Amino acid sequence: MSVASHQQPRATRARRLALVAAVAVAAVVIAAVVSSSGGSSPAPATPAAGGSAPTNALFTGIPEQNGVLGDPSAPVTITEFVDLQCPICAETSRTTLPQLIQNQVKTGKVKLDARALQFIGPDSVRAARVAAGAREQGRLWPFLAAFYAAQGQENSGYATDAFLRSVAQSAGVNADEALAYAQTDAAADQLNQANSEAQTRGIDSTPSFVVTGKDGKAHVVVGHDDASLTAAIKAAR
């Protein structure tokens, strides 16, 4: 999908993202409220976190530390900025990332990092908080993939505690620990840092990728654009 076709229907979300950093403290307060009520919020039936076995197999044997997937000494770092409710992020997870992981990450050429933004709505906040808990367990990337596989309708209230627990379990995450971590100040700090970094880098839509080589030069790719991402990786080497 081209950058233009990705960005056009998401222009409203892009504008809203610019507001996130300015209201980060307020977002944390809101997150605490919605997280505490997540298990009882009205929501559609919890989708099954399908595809957990092949999803987890993709990550077998790849180290993950502090959310960084791959060999820590890999010469190229790709940081993906996502919103877990973003359908294009889910599409990218299904179509682009498996090949990238097989060909670039498992071979030690690239390592992946992620920043979970939360501009679509409260379900994004709840999901990002539990993703922070998965990061602490070295299972962020399996959690992201499992969430996308079970992704519901935007802002329908589907990201309840029960839904997030199911996703976490399918990704090999200790769900109790992840949901408990989601309520902490440390989880809120992760969200605020992600929002701040997005603003600093001028990231205003998801997915966006920052590709950095050993020289520290950053190449930004916006949207689900495989050709541009491949070119950025080559340029970063």
Question: What are these model-predicted stretches?
Answer:
Residues 56, 73-75, 127, 205-206:
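A structure-centric signal for secondary-structure junctions around beta-strands
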